[in-house]
Amino acid sequence: MHNLENKNASNKKPKKIVVSDLIAILTYLMEIKNKMTNKELWKIRHICLTGSYNNNQMSIMKILMNKFPKTINVPFDKQNNTYLHQSIFNRHKIFVDFFMNELNDNINYRSKNKIGISHLHALVNYGYIDHIETAIIKDPGAIQQLSDDGQNILEFAVIPCFSIISNKNSEPYKKSNTTIINIIKTLSKSITKLDLQSRNKMGYRAIECAVRYCSTDVIDELISLGFSINESRLKNRIFPTINNNDLIGFATQIDRLDMVKHLINIGAPIHMYHINKHNKLLVPTCLVVAIKFKRDQCIHYLLNLPESIQALSNNTIKKYLFNIATNAGCTNHEIISKLCPKTYDDKKLRKNCNRYKISVFEQHENKIERNIKNYYKRRFMILDSISNMLSILCSIYNFSDNDSDLHKITRTVVSLEANLLLKYTTINNVYETVADFVDHIELTDIQYCFETVSNSEIMKASDCIINEYFISMKKLGIFKKINRLIKSKNIINTLLNEFDSDSESTDDDSDTKRACSCGCQSCYDSDEDPVCDSNESDNSNDINNHVKSDNKLNSSNDYYDEDDSEDNYNNQSDDEPLVKNDVVNTINTITPNQNLENTFNENNVMINNINFEKTLNNKHQSFQDNICENISENISEKIPNNNRDNNCNNNHNNNIQGDKELFDKPLHLQYTRLTKLHEHYIHKSLYKLRHPIKLNQYDTVYNLLTSLDPYVKNNNNILVFNSDNKLIAKIFSLSIKSDTDYINDINSENDNVNMYHEKTKLQIRSKPSRWIRFYSQNICGLDKQDPNHMFPFVLDRILNDWPCIERRIRDKIHPDGLDSLLYFYGELLINGEMIRGCFEYFINSNNSVFHRLFREEYKLPQNIRDTLDESINVLSY
């Protein structure tokens, strides 16, 4: 048939074929065929199951099924859908009736498509009551089968129908509440008992789905079936309400006042929340949810309940609810007047309204999408994983020597690992996302923290050893940005808490996404590549593992697993330059096995027998296993005796002994690894080189910024090596007298009084007042590609916090700003010799670098040379 169509298409005037002749030809072809290919099955599906129905389509399908009845269970598209799947999803009732009546003995009702929906699940979801009864009579055990998302048969009965239709002109099918009740009654007649307490991978049951999508009559039917609504909460938490046995709180969250009233009338418990585990202050969780999500009608109703009246009699609880209302942006004066404590005035009211802008949430979600593929299709699980990682980091920072803190950290780690086992994301993606939130690209900090707290042997060690580990973790660079971590944690928790509310819509597409726990409508589109890829054989194991991990968490003795409060920390500046030391991953190597042997002469320094251990990144190994491949290389360098005054020569001779002590210490060789976040920052910093026209040197600068040059950085100096492990640059530390001038300059940035006189003087500072954010168009131009201009670009990442000589002058383009001229004292390998001088940077008030040059010492301005002479304790010469 396929060849016949192609032959006809190639002719200019194809011969018209009568439909009856086509059926006869197809019948003949079927008689001589021994098997059908997937392409042929898909072609017949395209002819029969799309478009409007006619008798010819049924004739073709009957011819196929009479010859090959087993093809009813054969998947033919990328989503592994069968003909029965497609007939149900497209609501071709005549084909469904034909398959169920004529091929009932050949149908495997447990056959799943690629997203884990079986034939019986599809029949129940679309409300084919007569055929449901036929199916459960033939295969009673199929009623207990779960989907790949852990959904049981009752959930498919109450959730909306999946909008998986090929005919775009058709309206999505909606089951009536009467149909849902009849389906539940039909399923209850099965000889196989239904598991009423089964929870899907999101942690909720069928009754929670009914609270969201169905009427109160469906709730009554489920309760008569045996569902319990009097279960206690799993944790002393407010959010999430959907998987914490808080039906009233969940109904309040989705703003279903009719369901709230009905649940209270039939005896559903109003759960009380301990606002602090150290006291007995209780508040209804549904009231907190209603205030947080601004459900005004529910608030008015809940405020009249006896539990709410008793709670509001306490001024502490009143203040707690008032803070939630102001932060949520409540503008209802009647509600505010009932919640406002008597001691509050207008000033305190304004102070408590510290809400985040919508753009802040959008920025965080954009960063998540940049690091995690298909984020919006699996929002809940990914947000939950990121929230757990941020909670781990904040708990490490706040760790004190007690069992409860350690238990909380361990429990959070278990929860994070359970989420990651669901294959919705990877641990490396979470690392990169958290690092992106705080502009900290040193992923090994986060990796080291997680590897440490997830190591059961370390967590079971003595208190002294555990404290040492936590002290070492608190010294990592990631915790210098603790304010950003806490802010990001609060933002992610807000997104997580409002996930169900945000997705609530009357649109059927949104209902469809929520019907599938992964929210992945494209999973059902037969014309797209599938996203969810779960093996049917592994389905039960994954679900059992998930349930076991949930039970471990639920059986914890620590019931008071409170919602994370906003901890207060000292305000500190989190602004960091765009191109900086931590734009790349750095991993410290093990101490070299051999000591460093130094040979010093009067006028030169020889360095021999350095044994480095190079760190390579291996995604399939843990952090401890990443250290491998020992590289032994003889590195020699010779420093010439340049002309310099006697004072500096004496200083050089006095520092030889200090050099010996420096090189006798273990060297920590740091290697770089290109990451997605690295590429993002590099690409952003080169904006001026590609807009509006891409310059010729763009690729050169990009390659230099992403070069993998190793370096060694300690308190005294920086050593930079090339790819052959040869020393090519040194930067020495300078003695710092005081940073008072530096602080004064920062505080008086926009002060125009005597600005020129005060800012032009030279100062030795502990770090530059500003650093590189963008590269200007003249960097690496045709006349700036000599060795002096092309010194290692890795220094642009690691000098942002290094002592330097700085001169600040008025910005001619922006008169209110100040430009910085920076000098870093060191040596550079030029023509095989180490030349002493200064690495010079010129950075304007907008943090754009216009000039980077290594200037030999004899070419330095006299005032720079005099300042260098005044600096004491140059560690290496």
Curated annotation (Swiss-Prot):
UniProt keyword annotation of Transmembrane present: no
SMART domains the record matches: ANK (SM00248)
Region: Disordered, residue numbers: 525-579
Residue spans of the ANK repeats: 44-74, 79-109, 115-145, 202-231, 243-272, 282-311
Domain of life according to the entry: Viruses
Record key words, sorted: ANK repeat, Repeat
Gene3D superfamilies named among the record's database cross-references: Ankyrin repeat-containing domain (1.25.40.20)
InterPro entries in UniProt: Ankyrin_rpt, Ankyrin_rpt-contain_sf
Stretches with biased composition (Low complexity): 533-544
Record keyword Signal present: no
Protein's recorded name: Putative ankyrin repeat protein R748
Organism listed in the record: Acanthamoeba polyphaga mimivirus (APMV)
